[in-house]
Structure formats: C-alpha cells, structure tokens
C-alpha cells in the first residue's frame, strides 16, 4: 500500500475516488466477497421475504406506501423497491425505475447538497429491482454515479461535519455495492470510501465521539441513520465492519442517544432530542424518527450487550415511527427478537468524554427531571460558543438554548443564537474586545462571551490529524470530574480556555445534582482586571417571577426555583419581549421563529466589581403545583464556601476545584479531577 492524495485519483479511470485528503489506497481493488446476485444490499430475496413474514404488519404498511400512498421520493422509492423484490412485481419495479431515470437525467448534483440521498435511493432501486432494468438503463445509472463522484471530489471533506457522512459518503458507498461487478469503477471507489473512513473519519469519531456523543451536537440526528444504513449494507454484502473501526463511538452511541431524548412522549408518539448547537428540534420533524432508527440498528447489532438490551426496552416505548410513510424503517429495523433489559434500574447518567457531554436523569419515567452539561472542545461548524452551558427539563424545558437558528450566518445567528449570551454560562465584558466574521456573517456585537479565534470562519477543522496538530487552538475545555453516587451526581469543568486570555484568568464550574431536582452550581471566575464585569446568564423559557435572590420560572407543568447565594448583593436584570435580543445598543432579532425558545434572558452580576468572583446558585426543578423549597444557607470563609440545602451539606474550595458533600450522615470528597475530556 502507498500513501497518495485521493483528489488525484479522479484522473484515473480505474479508481475515480470520491474524496480529498490523505488515505491509504491499494493499487488494485481488494477482493471482496460481494454476492454476484441481486438483491444484495439488504440481504437476499429470501431474507427479505422471511422478514415480510416475520414483520407482517409493518410490511403491509410498506406495501400501502409503495402502491397507494403519497410520500416523499425517498420513502416512496425504497418502499417500491422492497415490495418489488419481495413480491417479484415487475410492474412496480418498472415504475420505480422510471422515477430513478427521471431523477438521474437532470444536472449532476455537486457541492453542499445531499446528493448522497439521490445516489442512495437510486442504488436501492438498482439493486432490488435489478432484473427489471435494461442494459442501457444500468449503464445510464453507472454514468450518473461516476459523474457525481467525480464532480464532488472536493465536496464535504470535513469528517467532523455531517456532510461527509450524510450528504456524500453513505450514498456513494451504497451505489458501489449496488453496482459492484457491473460498474468498472465501483470496486476502486468503494476501496476509497473504506480507506477514507478508516484513516480520517474513524479517528474523528473516536476523538469527538468517544462515549457516543458527538461534538457537532444536534446534527448527529440528521446524518447518523443514513450512515448506519450504509454500515449495515457493508456488513451484509461482504462483512466489512465499519463499527469495529470506531468502537469508542459506535459501542456507546445508542446509550448516549437514549440520554439525548427529553422525558415524555410528544407529537405523533415521538421523543424530542435535547438541543445541542444548531438544530434543536423544537418542532416535530423526521429527525426524531431517524434518531429512533439509529438506536434500533445499534441495539440489534449489539443485542447480547445488557446496556443495548436496555436501549431496546427504551425504543419499544415508542414502537412505531411517527411519520406514516416511514413504514419501511419499521420493517427493516424494528427487531423485536432482542431481549428487553430493565430500563427502570439502568444507570441514570452518562458521560461522553469526546465532546465533553454529561447527561443525567432523576429516573426513567416520563415525568423525570433531565439535565445536560457541556464542557468540551471545538471541532466543527455547527457548535456554539457555549462551554459550561447546561439544560434543565421537567415536564418541559425550564432553561434552554436561546435564540433561533434562522439561517447560517445571519445577523441573529452570529450575534446572538450561537454566541455565549444565548446560553447558560458566564460572560466577562471587555469593552475593546471584538470578534471576527463568523460563518461569513458579520459579528458586530460584544456580548462578553467566548472567543471565536480559529482559522476557518466556521470554526471547523478538517480531521483528527489536523485537530491534533492545532490542538492549542481547538482544545478549549476540560471535563475535570464526573461521578454519580445515586442520590447525587457531581460534575466539574474548566471553561477557561474558551475565552480570550486577555480578559480571563480562569472560569471553573462545579455542579452537584441532588436527585430528584436540585442543582447546586458553583462558579469560580477570575478576570484579568477588576473593572471587567462578570455576568451569570440564564436562558429562561418563561419570564421569571420574584425579586432579590429568589426567582421562579414556570413553564406548563414544570417549575424552576432559582436562589442566588453568591455574590452577596447582586444585581438581577431580565430581558424579554422587544429587549430579548438586544445588547450593546443593537438589536439582533431572528428572521423566523423555529419553535418555542427561551422568552427571557436573566443576568446576575456582582454589585461591586472585583478581579475574582464566586457565583453560587441553587436551582430546584419541581412540578408547577409544588411550593417553594426551603431556602439554602451559605457561609463563606477565606478558603471555602459552605452551603446547606435540604439534607445535604456541601463545601467548595475557593482556590481550586474540589470540596466535599455530606448527605445522610456520610461525608464524601468532591474530586478535583476524576475524569478528563481527553
């Protein structure tokens, strides 16, 4: 094997590789045990016919979509192809082929468009309806496939970004398996796909996806299902195991994905994923079904693992996809032969060190309290400037992500939505600080937040090797501690490097979660100068009610009590209505509404400026009918801060991260560094 640049392969008819960047490529395509007969992408005809008998109800819904119902192109073509293969229905196959021929007769897609979906669904029709294609039609598809590959050598090259997987590669790989032996270039292109994944994408998944979370955030729900669809095709066709190339990600992804769902079953029997960066899923969409399908594939794959048996039990609480024309996903991926684990007794928190995510719940019932905390590094475009940010949910969001994703690089996006001001973390205002253009949008606002000092305007890095080379730029945070003791959970993060060193010495955040609903949040913040104002920011779903140090947020059936214990004598400001998106004398309203978002920004600042400040808050999530909790009590000394809340007594150190907790007569240390993000 020799190291070459894949971009140069387009010029060679023998390979015609689809990618750009270094990868190992054999001079001759490797010998693969791909079946020569069709269908093969989803197994043999006999396998599909057996599935139709085993999953008869789901299959009949597929038949209805294939023959009667209106549907999007993807669902329609996949359903038609499945029924054609299972029932050997030539007429239906020819209808599907006619749709494909129309799709591939147009201009060759290129650039940041999801051409993988076109390739993927057309390839599925090619394979499952293979005997009904004429030789000339097959050649026409080969030409379309090869020209699409060649046109997109330099498209979607960043492997921390959803586009590499969902817009590009899954479709190319699927088309290669469908046309193997018949398209002279398919074998070499498929080798390029595998080697690109092995040498660039897998290391990225291991780095930014260790523990099953993903640094890009919510966008994982937009691409993971399609990528797993391709991984299953590879496994079925020739035994290639893409999962084994990135085990730190794949073996934990289903569990992390389960924790990424808010409690409660909502629109059309779906579960809403938590907001992480761009996206956010505030209103119902097909991404919810994609998330379920991805968990189903992984639960079936790792069926002998007890944790995945619990995931299967969780999946079965929403046994049917919400979108009716997605019946083919139920048919293909709902595997009821997996043993159901005991969901109620499963762990109630999960740490994903790659992206620096901690997820926690009070229980596994639908009325549980849900908590999310992020303190991780920079990888790609759809991340926000949100290190130290957290979410709290009970019967609905209580504190969330501010702003609206009204477009990529809009004035609202780059001055509010992705900025620190729209998140539940700390801001330090230096009057002279400026931000470069972000996402090709003009950043005019000084929100006092985290920096955006990366070479690419998106803040993106191409792959793990480039990230490691530029680690001093992209390694901006550390998850210092994570421990769950049942009644309480403790996390600690160092957020310091996410800010300009010209204004901040350090910012550490420690959170003790006392189940079921109390959160003690202690922040140590040291500015470079005493005159730099510090602000503790909270994005409230509804305008808080109260005064002084005690406030209440009520959203539907949920309520959050907020107690500010430090600094003493704080100033509290609320920004809502026309003032919500205004700061620094400018207003940055969104161009469109993306669904229910925080309606008020709460800002807490010390009454007196100082170089070092300590912020201490107690947040208690309850039912809306619950009365106020007992007031927490705080005492401060030269070296420590002591707080009594309920039955717990907690101590935090002032000079460094760490402390102790005493609960039910048992004293335990709060670790200063029990786990790290790398």
Residue spans for each PLM region:
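Boundary at the C-terminal end of the N-terminal hydrophobic targeting segment
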Residues: 20, 25-29
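Aromatic-lined, polymer-binding surfaces characteristic
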Residues: 32, 38-41, 48, 52-55, ...
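Bacterial N-terminal signal peptides that target proteins for export
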Residues: 1-11
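Carbohydrate-active enzyme catalytic cores, enriched for enzymes
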Residues: 179, 222-398, 605-615, 629-678
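Extracellular adhesion/glycan-binding regions together with long Ser/Thr-
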Residues: 592-607
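Catalytic and substrate-binding regions of extracellular carbohydrate-active enzymes
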Residues: 319-559, 563-571, 579, 609-624, ...
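Acidic/polar, glycine-enriched structural segments that form the non-catalytic walls/loops
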Residues: 28-63, 130, 489, 540, ...
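Cleavable N-terminal signal peptides
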Residues: 13-14, 25
């Amino acid at each position: 094997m020799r190291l070459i640049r894949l971009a140069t392969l387009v010029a060679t008819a023998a390979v015609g590789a689809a990618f750009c960047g270094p990868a190992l490529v054999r001079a001759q395509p490797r010998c693969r045990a791909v079946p020569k007969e069709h269908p093969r992408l989803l197994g043999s005809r006999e396998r599909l016919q057996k599935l139709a008998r085993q999953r008869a109800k789901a299959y009949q819904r597929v038949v209805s979509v294939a023959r009667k119902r209106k549907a999007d192109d993807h669902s329609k073509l996949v359903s038609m192809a499945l029924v054609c293969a299972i029932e050997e229905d030539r007429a239906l196959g020819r209808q599907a082929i006619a749709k494909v021929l129309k799709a591939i007769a147009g201009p060759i897609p290129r650039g940041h468009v999801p051409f993988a979906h076109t390739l993927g669904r057309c390839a599925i029709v090619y394979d499952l309806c293979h005997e009904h294609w004429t030789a000339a039609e097959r050649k026409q598809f080969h030409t379309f496939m090869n020209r699409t590959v060649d046109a997109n050598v330099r498209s979607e090259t960043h492997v921390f970004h959803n586009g590499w997987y969902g817009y590009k590669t899954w479709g190319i790989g699927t088309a290669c398996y469908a046309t193997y032996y018949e398209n002279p270039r398919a074998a070499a292109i498929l080798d390029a796909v595998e080697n690109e994944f092995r040498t660039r994408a897998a290391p990225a998944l291991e780095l930014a996806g260790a523990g099953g979370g993903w640094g890009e955030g919510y966008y994982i729900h937009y691409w993971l299902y399609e990528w797993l669809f391709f991984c299953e095709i590879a496994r079925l066709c020739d035994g290639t195991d893409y999962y084994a190339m990135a085990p730190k990600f794949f073996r934990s992804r289903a569990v992390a994905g389960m924790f990424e769902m808010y409690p409660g079953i909502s629109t059309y029997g779906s579960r809403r994923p938590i907001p992480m960066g761009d996206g956010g899923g505030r209103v119902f969409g097909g991404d919810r079904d994609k998330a379920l399908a991805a968990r189903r594939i992984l639960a079936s794959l790792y069926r002998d693992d007890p944790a995945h048996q619990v995931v299967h039990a969780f999946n079965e609480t929403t046994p049917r996809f919400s979108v009716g024309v997605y019946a083919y996903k139920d048919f293909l991926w709902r595997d009821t032969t997996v043993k159901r684990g005991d969901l109620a007794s499963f762990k109630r928190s999960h740490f994903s060190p790659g992206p620096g995510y901690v997820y926690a719940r009070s229980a596994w019932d639908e009325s549980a309290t849900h908590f999310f905390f992020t303190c991780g590094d920079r990888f790609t475009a759809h991340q926000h400037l949100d290190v130290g940010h957290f979410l709290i949910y009970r019967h609905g969001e209580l504190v969330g992500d501010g702003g609206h994703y009204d477009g990529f690089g809009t004035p609202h996006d780059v001055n509010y939505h992705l900025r620190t001001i729209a998140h539940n973390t700390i801001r330090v205002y230096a009057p002279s600080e400026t931000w470069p253009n972000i996402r090709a949008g003009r950043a005019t606002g000084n929100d006092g937040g985290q920096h955006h000092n990366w070479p690419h305007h998106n803040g993106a890095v191409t792959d793990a090797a480039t990230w490691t080379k530029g680690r001093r730029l992209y390694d901006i945070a550390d998850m210092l501690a994570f421990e769950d003791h049942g009644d309480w959970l403790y996390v600690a993060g160092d957020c310091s490097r996410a800010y300009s060193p010209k204004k901040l010495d350090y910012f550490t955040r420690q959170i003790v979660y006392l189940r079921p609903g109390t959160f003690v949040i202690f922040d140590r913040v040291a500015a470079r100068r005493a005159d730099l104002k510090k602000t503790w920011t909270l994005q409230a779903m509804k305008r808080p009610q109260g005064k002084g140090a005690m406030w209440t947020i009520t959203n539907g059936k949920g309520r959050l009590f907020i107690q500010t214990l430090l600094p003493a004598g704080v100033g509290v400001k609320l920004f809502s209505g026309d003032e919500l998106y205004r700061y620094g004398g400018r207003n940055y309203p969104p161009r469109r509404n993306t669904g229910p978002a925080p309606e008020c920004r709460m800002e807490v600042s010390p009454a007196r400026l100082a170089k070092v400040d300590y912020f201490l808050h107690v947040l208690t999530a309850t039912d809306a009918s619950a009365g106020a909790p007992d007031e927490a009590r705080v005492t401060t000394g030269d070296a420590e801060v002591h707080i009594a809340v309920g039955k717990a007594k907690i101590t935090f150190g002032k000079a460094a991260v760490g402390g102790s907790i005493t609960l039910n007569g048992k004293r335990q240390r709060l670790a200063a560094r029990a786990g790290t993000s790398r």
